[in-house]
Every structure is written in C-alpha cells, then in structure tokens.
Amino acid sequence: MTNEKWKIAFYGEEDFAARMKGNVTPWLYQNVVSGTTLSLDGIRLQYYYALNPERGKTITFIHGFGEFFGKYHEVMHLFYQAGYSVFFLELRGFGRSQRLVSDPELIHVNSFNEYIDDVFAFQYQIVQPLTRGDVHILFGHSMGGCISTLFLERFPKFFDKAILSSPMLELDFRTSDWKLQALSMISTAPNLNAKPSPSFRPFNPKPDFAHSSCASEPRYMYQFSQRLASDKYHTSGSSYGWTRAAYAAMQEAIAYAGDIRIPLLILQAEHDHLVLPGGQQQVAQRARNAAIMKIPGSKHEIFNALTEARELYWQVIFTFLETPVSEIPAAG
C-alpha cells in the first residue's frame, strides 16, 4: 500500500520479501554510501548514509542492543521515500565497528559515555558537513533510545526533533534472570568488567521467532538471515561492565530529562517484554515538549509489527515530524 501524502510504500506480510528484493536491495546498492570514521578515543566506527536529492531533511538512526545496519534497511528506505537523507551509525562493539573485546558475541563498554562520544563524532565529522542547513531528526530505538536521551540532554542544539521508539529507560529484570543481573550491576571486581554477565547467552543459530521482539515473521527472518551470514552480527549478550553502565545510563537519562528542549516523541509498544513503561513516562513528563503514545498490538520492535500497528506507528511519526508536538493526541 502506498501512502500518497508522504510518498511512501508500506509492505505487507505477503509481499515483504519480494518488495525488499525488488525495491530496497537496488536502492541499497545504488544510493547507500558506507565508510568508517574514528570516535573521540580512536575507535573505528562503521557508518552508512544516503543523501536524498530533495535535501532539506536529515535523520540519524541510533540502533538498539545487538543490532546493525541490515536490520534497518526497510526503515531507512521509508524515510528516504519521504524525502529524508538517512544516516546510520553502528556503535562500537556492533556490526562492522571496532570491538573492545575479542568475543564477537559479547557486548561491552565501560560507560555509555563511550556511545555518546561515538554519536558526537559521527554527527560532527560525517553528518553535519554533508547536511548543513537541513532540519535534523534523531531516531533512537531501545538501547539507542537511552543513548539518544542522554545525547539530547548534553547537546540540546544538535537536533530539531527526536523520536524514541521503545526506549530502554527502565529494563524489565523480572524476565531476564533479574537476580543475576542485579548481581552483575553491583559487582565492581575489575577482573569481571569485560567478562560475560551471568545472563549472557551465546548466539543461537536456530531462529526463534516466537520469543523474538518482532510480530512480523518475514521481517524477523530478513534480519536473522543476515546474522547467520556473518559473525559480525552475532552480538547477543552483555558484559558485567555493560550491565552496570546501562543501569547508570538509565538513571541519568531520567534524572536530566528536563534538559531536553526540542520536541520529543516517545512511542511505546503495548506488549514489550524487554523494557518497562515507567521510565518512558518519567522522561515524557520531565522533558519540556514531549508526547508519548502506545501502539496497540505491537511488540518491542514496533517497526517490525504487523500491518495495522506498523502503519499506525508510521502515521504517528510522520504526523509528529510535520506538526507541533502539542497537536499529537496522547494515548494511554
């Protein structure tokens, strides 16, 4: 189905694979540029972008835990169709960016400040020079939503609007070995910092759609097939250091949300088994100009929901980008 107002084509469950092959894959080869840059501490970062010939609007994507560029092919193509230049950064330790540990399945940082530095370097060195004068939008999903919140608090003038999709602002430890996670958060033994946390699970080469964060099976299989093809996409569990860093980052993101000055849209999944809504509500209440909406029928990855929920999600996003945040209806 094509939305004439925003010039974008929505792909259903039945035609997703064919549309990706026929429309998105050629776009990736013809329009997307890839490259590397260095973060502030010299870590090598992989990035991707496509400059829209219409120019004037740019969106930067900050991905979630264990994610990589290939998971966002459809999302980036949708924004490109709507007239946006699109930029994607693979944070340190993810995808083809440099890792801090040798295990390709382990996710480790000492502090989320490292991710903030990655985003700053990407914006300053790559995005801004290519898009001067554009309206700049920040899009953060899950872990990327937490990183985006912190970035907006520290650098309130980099972006004009921001979208947080299922932002990781309060984790649901009840469904993820919470006692062991709590142990990893309070442990400060230096020799454990870069070691797998007690909740670490190695990459499983067998697909498990039923327990995934996707409601759309063809979208799940699209990204999972990429995971199987390269061990660079096998990141699957956190270190002790990452877990402690995430806990501190979520607390800071909520505490300083009042420093966010730009219009902010927070989108919640109705059936989110990874993050709790409380932290999202607190950020929405404290930020100066925020709207929050729950998308019925969606799981954690709302952009991978079934057709009805997914189209509502996009309708809310593009409406937000075109209108003042005060005009977007709130939902419970």
Regions picked out by a protein language model, each given a short descriptive name:
Residues 69, 76-102:
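Conserved alpha/beta-hydrolase
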Residues 1-38, 44-48:
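An N-terminal hydrophobic leader/cap segment in hydrolases
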Residues 260, 266-268, 272:
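Short beta-strand/loop motif that positions the catalytic acidic residue
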Residues 262, 276-285:
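Short alpha-helix in the alpha/beta-hydrolase fold that links the catalytic acid
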Residues 296-332:
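Catalytic active-site module of serine/aspartate enzymes centered on a nucleophile-bearing elbow/loop
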Residues 64-67:
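Active-site glycine-rich loops that stabilize anionic/oxyanionic intermediates
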Residues 107-127:
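Alpha/beta-hydrolase active-site loop
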Residues 147-234:
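Alpha/beta-hydrolase-fold enzymes
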